[in-house]
Amino acid sequence: MQTSPDMFINRELSWLRFNSRVLDQCSKNLPLLEKLKFIAIYCTNLDEFYMIRVAGLKQLFSAGVNASSSDEMTPLQQLKAIRKYLHQEKELLERYFNEITSELEKENLFIKHYENLDENLKQKCDEYFFSNIFPVIVPIAVDATHPFPHLNNLSFSLAVKICDKAHPELVKFGMIRIPRVLPRFYEVSANIYVPIESIVHQHAEEIFPGYKLLASAAFRVTRNADMVIEEEEADDFMMILEQGLKLRRKGAFVRLQIQKDADEQIVEFLNTHMKIFHKDVYEYSILLNLPSLWQIAGNKTFTHLLSPLYTPKTLPPFDENLSIFDAVEKEDILIIQPFESFDPVYKFIKEASKDPEVISIRMTLYRVEKNSNIVQALIDAASDGKQVTVMVELKARFDEENNLHWAKALENAGAHVIYGITGFKVHAKVSQVIRKQGDKLKFYMHLSTGNYNASSAKIYTDVSYFTSKAEFARDTTSFFHILSGFSKNRRLQTLSMSPNQIKEKVLEMIRIETSKKNEGVIVAKMNSLVDSDIIQALYEASMEGVQIDLIIRGICCLKPDEEYSKNIRVRSIIGKYLEHARVFYFKHSEPNYFISSADWMPRNLERRLELMTPIYDERSKAKLAQFLRLQLSDNVLAYELKNNGEYEKIPSSEKIIDSQQTLEEYVSKIYKTLKKDTDQSRATHLASKLFKEN
């Protein structure tokens, strides 16, 4: 099949539409502070998009690259399209923010500027300024003897235009850097938040004594944060990475956000020194630095403005009184997070660290929280003399410094730490525990779609799979040998790994379904679909009558509902949990269910070490089948992709189905039912039965 550029949706525009769906949550009937969270998430996503994707396009344009995507849009065309899209969407962001803050005021929760406070609260702000703000802010003069300062990525500042009180004709420009140690808002009372820049503006003349404030403008800068590391030339990768992190802080400016109606001379002053293209200047009529809205959304006094807090549940066959190794030895176990608890994953490593029969623990780490109980358990195990091998991916973007910290701590404890594979990121999520019982070695494995991160496990939907099967023991051992040693053979037998093998396997399974024509069925859930070879194979399958359902949260470059894709339906689910699981079903493959750490993107399939895990266990397959069926029935959180690249909400029917809420309710129902039953085998059977029925 011959493909053409118009058969693909542009990757960058598809991502922007994903982020628009995040912002669209503000239009739904959600608690107000939940809407505020979605604004914070939307703005955080946009920060990273500019730091990496827009910065990359600017570099391609500067290098004279003409085409960089399957749709053959040039870097310049993409940059123009991105700017147009975001300048239009900025108005929607402003509208949602104003609507939400107005509704919050009706609930007696306020964001107020200094000038709108009563005298008593102004005095409290004044006291706070002199005790907490004044000692740490940095006043900066810019003139012939004071060069324009270095501004950190995502730094928040106040630009000022001032004049000498004795000589008003002498106008000067400077800025007040607001350090990150200060909160975004001063909580002047239990229900009133004052933007920090509002207080700083009020006291600008005390910061620059002898000068009169003529104008000020809050602004925020975004820099290129992508790092290029010459791994081939690195003798000490950790040192090279630390140097790269320092250089990241000096990346080129790619965006300037500034308050609307700012003094023209201030805007010119900033543009002159930063050399930012005027289309990359975004003027806002609302507050800047909105990722910090989490500070308000976390207000414990207004919990009625938040969704009810759900507590993940641990279901049989896991039991707090039963060894996790005994449970996994009896059967394979699959859990769906965060509806089911992440605790068994932690217990798997914690128990291994304390078990005298355990001789080896191996694990990959990609994104780890700052205070990780899992890593602490690994440190304890290494300190006790167990053989601990940990692959810490130091190139995990924006987690590099945290991962460096843990890598050093693990090394100091005696663990064997692998920093990465030259030219690749290790994105696979796998751990292996080896126990010696008598003269036999027993293997226990955990394979997952998500990170070993207890914090993100509460808000990301992922699938975890525990097994002790010999074929998984063989392949995970081979995988860790590939990571720690020299190996030209990067192929496994039961598991599939990338680079190359996962893509080959996926294409092979698509071809099998294609050969079955109208009998073929493919259901695939992932974060993003970009790979043009896989998209082409899906088009060919569709033309042969294969029914294809894709559940893709983020980027989708496939264009549905065309002559070549009339049997392909694409939906995206956006809810309070971030859909992160990768689950694939191919009707005529054996086995026909798979979970993976990899999306169908070139970076995952060609430039990362990933794993795809076949699911043989019948109970686990039934659980995945119900999970996919539920998501395909969702008519609350789901959007459908049209052939013009736009997404439409799926209309609700008589039966309202919110897939995330439904899973919360049914896992809770199973948990409550099981708490009444003390018979372990009956409880396990009932859990499976209830999940399937529900």
Curated annotation (Swiss-Prot):
Q: Which InterPro entries does the UniProt entry name for this protein?
A: PP_kinase, PP_kinase_C_1, PP_kinase_middle, PP_kinase_middle_dom_sf, PPK_C_dom2, PPK_N_dom, PPK_N_dom_sf
Q: CDD domains, per this entry?
A: PLDc_PaPPK1_C1_like (cd09165), PLDc_PaPPK1_C2_like (cd09168)
Q: Where does the record place the catalytic residues?
A: 427
One annotated GO molecular function: ATP binding
Gene Ontology terms describing biological process: polyphosphate biosynthetic process
Give the catalytic activity: [phosphate](n) + ATP = [phosphate](n+1) + ADP
Co-factor requirement: Mg(2+)
The positions annotated for binding Mg(2+) are: 367, 397
Q: How is it modified after translation?
A: An intermediate of this reaction is the autophosphorylated ppk in which a phosphate is covalently linked to a histidine residue through a N-P bond.
Q: What class of enzyme is it?
A: transferase
Q: Would you say which domain of life the source belongs to? A: Bacteria
In short, the EC number is 2.7.4.1
GO cellular component assignments: polyphosphate kinase complex
Q: Where does ATP bind?
A: 45, 460, 553, 580
Give the keywords, sorted.
ATP-binding, Kinase, Magnesium, Metal-binding, Nucleotide-binding, Phosphoprotein, Transferase
Reply yes or no: does the keyword Magnesium apply.
yes
Described purpose of this protein according to its UniProt entry = Catalyzes the reversible transfer of the terminal phosphate of ATP to form a long-chain polyphosphate (polyP).
Record-stated family? Belongs to the polyphosphate kinase 1 (PPK1) family.
Its protein name is: Polyphosphate kinase
Upper taxonomic lineage? Bacteria, Pseudomonadati, Campylobacterota, Epsilonproteobacteria, Campylobacterales
Name of the gene this protein is made from: ppk
